[in-house]
Amino acid sequence: SSVANLEGRVMRYPRMDKEVLATYSKGVIASSGCPSGIIQTRLRLGQFDEALRAAGEFQDIFGKDNFFIELMDHGLPIETQVTGDLLTIAKKLNAPLLATNDSHYVHAEDAGAQDAMLCINSGSRLDDPDRFKFDGTGYYIKTAEEMRELFKDHPDACDNTLVIAERCNVMFDDHEDGAFMPKFPCP
């Protein structure tokens, strides 16, 4: 992500191409991504073959055991529209499923505070009908039970979150200042 932030910004968003991904792919576990990612975007545009090809390329880059087809459900039409195709891609590539949740706040009752923060960030008001806001619901850290209920038709997608957790073995050295971020020179 450092390369994406330092060298790959497109507008204000960090991005990296597949060559950079391949360079740093060793030991990385990846998923197909959210609705704004290339795979789901291609599916929404009716370009199934291109979505399948992109998923296959990611699987080649990260390895068959390290690339997961990601399922999300916030009640958004753009998510439900592509779920069937994502399942088909997973089957065609023999890729495991992964249940994820886009989390922007800790508890469900924090949604109002998040909404207010979005208004502060964009300089708009809560009563502005045209302001930026999240569509759908459930952008908080869900419990295992909530996720299993949401993805009850695909329990393996929830199981795979545990498979990934068990595979992650990261140790951080103690730092004097408590920070684990790289130090970048200030201009």
Predicted segments — roles?
Residues 1-187:
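Phosphodiester-processing cores and adjacent nucleic acid-binding clamps
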